[in-house]
Structures are given as C-alpha cells and as structure tokens.
Curated annotation (Swiss-Prot):
Component of the type III secretion system (T3SS), also called injectisome, which is used to inject bacterial effector proteins into eukaryotic host cells. Forms a ring-shaped multimeric structure with an apparent central pore in the outer membrane. HAMAP family: Type_III_secretin. Residues 1-22 form the signal peptide. The gene is sctC. The core secretion machinery of the T3SS is composed of approximately 20 different proteins, including cytoplasmic components, a base, an export apparatus and a needle. This subunit is part of the base, which anchors the injectisome in the bacterial cell envelope. Forms a stable homooligomeric complex. The keyword tRNA processing does not apply. This is Type 3 secretion system secretin. Disulfide bonds: none annotated. It comes from Shigella sonnei. It is found in: Cell outer membrane.
Length: 566
C-alpha cells in the first residue's frame, strides 16, 4: 500500500508541470475531427494573422491602421484562403498578394490613381501584369484600350506596384536603341498566327491571321505577295519591303515617323503559334504592342440550327404571322420584324420546338436536320448539306465535265452587341432538285438536265439572350404517295392486292429555320465524369422499375442535373 502511494505521488509530480503548461497555451488551436480551429479572444489583427501565417505560406504585412482592430470568434483554419476572404469582408479589411507577401490594410486606406502612358499601350501593360501573376481581378485597371490613360483603385501595395511597373516599361521603350539589330519571338494565346481557309461551295474563304494583318499594316494595306495570294492556309511571311516615306497612315501614338518601321521582317511559325520579328529593339516593341492588342480572348457561342418543314395550314393554326405576332396558346406571344421584305422573328425557341414536336406526331411537321455548332464571336460557322450532279459537255473537238451543287447551306457569323445581345450575319441558301437519277436523252442525243431551284436569304439580325431566331416561311409543294392496306387480309397471296389501294396527297409545306444562339461560359462547363455514377444508377433503376416519364425534354444544364438526380 505504501509502495502504491509513493508511485502515484511520483507520477503526479512528473505530470503536474505538463498540465499547467497545457492550460497556458496561447495558440488556442484545437483539433476537432481533423479540422483545425482557432479561437480568438479580442486579438489584434496583427497578432491574429501572425498565429497562422505559416498556413497561408506567405509572410503577412499588416498596416498600422489595420493592426488597431480586434477580432473575436472561432475560425476554421482548414481552408485559409476562404477564411481570409470571409474575415476581411466582415472586419472591413482589404488585402493584396504579390506572390512574395500578403499585405493587409484597413478599408479606409484604399487609394486611387490616374496614370498616363506615353510609349506602351494599356493592353500591353495588363498582359504584362497577368503574365507576371501580379494582376488582381478584384481591382481591375479601368480605361479605354485604345487610350493611354487608365485608372486604378485598390490597396496601396497594388496601386504602387502598377504605377511603378507602368513607369518602368514606359522608360524601357523610350530608351530602346534604334541601331542594333535584334530578334524577338511573340507568342499568341487567343488567336491564330496563320491564315485559315474555309471552302464553301467551291469558294475559298480566307480568315487572315495576325501575321497577315500586321504585314498588311506595315505595307500600308497593299496587295499581298504572290506566294500569299495562293490562299495557303499556313503561309510564311517575310517582310523586306520598305515602307513608303511619304505615307502617314500609321495609327501608333508612339510612332512619330513612318521610317521607324523600315526593314522589319516577320515570319509566322504555326507550330508554336508565334511570330518571329527581326529589327531593332524599338521596332520589335512596336510590333509586340500591336499584336498584344490584336490577341484578345473571344467568347464562345453555341448555335443550334433547326431545319423544319411544317404544313402550311398547321403553321397558320400556330399563329405565325411574319409581319405581326405569333401566339402559342394563351401564355406565350412574340413580336416580329415588321419589315415587309423580311421573314424574321425572335421567339422562345423551346416553346416553338415543343409545338413542332406535337405536330410531328401527327405527321404535320418534320425536323429535317438539327446540327449543333460551337464557334467563337466574329468567326463564321458553316453548315452545308449538299448534293452534286455532273454533266458532260461534249463539243466537236473537246469535252469537259461540269458539276452543279445544290442543297442547304447556312453561314452564320455571330458577335456580341454592346448590350450583350447576339448579333448574327446570316446567309441561308436552300436548293432542291427533281428526283431524276439518270439523265434522259431526246431524239438529238442531248441530255435533259434536272431542274434545280434555289432560295437564298441574307440578313443581319440581333437576338436577345435566351431567345431564338426564326427565319423562312417560303412555301413549296410536295407530292406523297402512300399505300394503304387492311391488316392480315392484304397479306393473303394473289387476292391480297384487292385489299390495298394507293393514295396521293399534294400539300403545301413551309420550310423554316430556327437558330438558337447561346453563349458558353466557363460556369457552363460540366465534367461528365461526375455524372458517370449517376448515369449508372439510373440505368440500374430502369432495369428494376418503370420510370413514369421516359420522354424528357432537357432545356438546359440545370434540367440535365435534375434528370440525373431523378
């Protein structure tokens, strides 16, 4: 018994200092379910951030005014970045991180500055800050891209950094030498350096690349060289011609004499989407400034094209009036273009398609095609479904083979208006031919060619976000032959034909084109791998039970998520 008391007393003496020290720990860090917690009790901002600066992996610099504030409460340290955002918003602090340190200020210390650039463009400065990971989207640089003056407001560390960077870059350009020949590589990130060629019904459409645009600018818009005139989709560019001394067409505010751009050489390098520049430092800087302003990110647009044939009487019953209004039931209406020469309207495409699908079940409408094209603003999207027949032209001494192409061609060039609406330049060509597969020959042994009809629509339309564009309305006749038979009786040999009869129907069909433009943002991107498990579960449910609604119209991504979560 005495031995047990001695051992207990000895253990108590050893553990007593540890217990006392544990009660005096200042960190107040707790581990609850593997989540770090911090309890602040009227801590100053400086001492508060000092305790977990290691979690942010940045040294923290707190201003004197911000250090006067005090913080109390329990904070989750498992996500330091998220905690920093919430804390600064609640306490009234602003912060900026330049990659080396985190600067924290009181919201009242926010400063503003107007800066004038002399030699570089605003777009070049912004791109430089982004490449150096110094640009903060929370405090954007405001100003006209084509102007030399900009405004910035934010934490003092950010404003001073931007001002010093702008001054340094401006001085570097002004002190650049003009004698020494140098080389530069300018890499494009948002557009193509080489020309792109599209073929539309035998006609080549060339979208000039940045190298071609810059070359034309340096050559004062003169015609391209013979090698470039061959519509090579990826031509090399070598500019060795001198700029005319009496030309003053340059719009560079930093160029006071056109002779500065003499003897500049450019070569497009498509493999890395770069431009190689040969010239002195000032010339390279001017070319870099131009390319930076041209290399801008473009927004993506998804174009859903519906080619629909509707019975004319049913279309009238839907309430379509190309010069008035359209009504679908009692809950929907749309205003149309009142121009007498245009068959165009903007409407709710989903509701119109629902009405078309209902008519399709009655065989009063037919969705001929529904392609979906993803393009960028100011880039043409072409849909061409055509047929071609060939004709031999035989003369007395020579002969040739010619072809005629017809079908449905839709060419759309979308762009965004100042109000966020989608404006489209449209060219629609719809051609039909007779059903003759072989040519007929008359008594003179000359071929009788098939007849081809074409309808062409060319216009510019502006569509609000979420709406669709309905184009068309022209009518053509169709002849349909159908064999109607009595089941079972018509299959009896010999006498079964008695129970069959043919019917012919002549109807007027109206062809319309529905175009649904939609901007694709990064927030609209979905990782399909996340839906794999949900789809698998849905397939299992289909094999074990009957799902009430097998026909589901998915209007948008939210509907897709709801459908998968069913």
């Amino acid at each position: 018994m005495k031995k047990f008391n001695i051992k207990s007393l000895t253990l108590l003496i050893v553990l007593l200092p540890l217990i006392v020290n544990a009660n005096n720990i200042d960190s107040h860090l707790l581990e609850q379910n593997d989540i770090a917690k911090y309890v602040a009790q009227s801590d100053t901002v400086g001492s508060f951030f000092d305790r977990f600066s290691a979690l942010l992996n940045y040294p923290i610099v707190v201003s004197k005014q911000a250090a006067k504030k005090r913080i109390s409460g329990e904070f989750d340290l498992s996500n330091p970045e998220e905690m920093l955002e919430k804390l600064t918003l609640l306490v009234g602090l602003i912060w900026y991180k330049d990659g080396n340190a985190l600067y924290i200020y009181d919201s009242g210390e926010l400063i503003s500055k107007v800066i004038l650039l002399e030699n570089i463009s605003l777009n070049y400065l912004i791109q430089y800050l982004k490449d150096a990971n110094l640009y903060d989207h929370r405090y954007p640089i405001r100003g006209n891209i084509s102007d030399k003056t900009f405004y910035i407001s934010g934490p003092p560390a950010l404003v001073e950094l931007v001002a010093n960077t702008a001054t340094l870059l401006d001085k570097q350009v002004s002190s650049i030498g003009t004698d020494k020949v140098n080389f530069g590589v300018i890499k494009l990130k948002n557009t193509f350096v080489s020309d792109r060629t599209y073929n539309m019904r035998g006609e080549d459409i060339v979208i000039p690349g940045v190298a071609t645009v810059v070359e034309r600018l340096l050559n004062n818009g003169k015609a391209l060289s013979n090698r470039q005139a061959q519509n090579d989709p990826m031509p090399p560019f070598n500019i060795t011609q001198k700029v005319s001394e009496d030309s003053n067409d340059f719009s560079f505010s930093s160029v006071t004499n056109s002779s500065i751009l003499e003897d500049v050489s450019l070569i497009a390098y498509p493999e890395t989407n770069s431009i190689l520049v040969k010239g002195n430092d000032q010339q390279i800087q001017i070319i870099r400034d131009i390319i930076t302003q041209l290399d801008v990110a473009k927004r993506h647009i998804e174009l859903s094209l519906w080619i629909i044939d509707i019975d004319k009487s049913e279309l009238n019953n839907l309430g379509v009036n190309w010069q008035g209004t359209a009504s679908f039931g009692d809950s929907f209406g749309a205003s149309f273009n009142m121009s007498s020469s245009a068959s165009i309207s903007t409407l709710d495409g989903n509701k119109f398609i629902a009405s078309v699908m209902a008519l399709n079940q009655k065989k009063k409408a037919n969705v001929v095609s529904r392609p979906v094209i993803l393009t960028q603003e100011n880039i043409p999207a072409i849909f061409d479904n055509n047929r071609t027949f060939y004709v031999s032209l035989v003369g007395e001494r020579n002969s040739s083979l010619e072809h005629v192409t017809y079908g449905t061609l839709i060419n759309v060039i979308p762009r965004f208006s100042s109000r966020g609406q989608i404006e489209m330049s449209l060219t629609i060509e719809d051609g039909t031919g007779n059903s003759q597969s072989n040519y007929n020959y008359n008594n003179e042994n000359t071929s009788v060619l098939p007849e081809v009809g074409r309808t062409k629509i060319s216009t510019i339309a502006r569509v609000p976000q979420g709406k669709s564009l309905l184009i068309g309305g022209y009518t053509h006749e169709t002849n349909s032959n159908e064999i109607v038979s009595i089941p079972f009786l018509s299959s009896i040999p010999v006498i079964g034909n008695v129970f069959k009869y043919k019917t012919s129907n002549i109807s007027n069909i109206v062809r319309v084109f529905l175009i649904q433009p939609r901007e694709i943002k990064e927030s609209s991107y979905y990782n399909t791998a996340e839906y794999k498990s949900l789809i698998s579960e849905r397939e299992i449910q289909k094999t074990t039970q009957i799902i009430p609604s097998e026909t589901t119209l998915l209007e948008d991504e939210k509907s897709l998520v709801s459908y998968l979560n069913y």
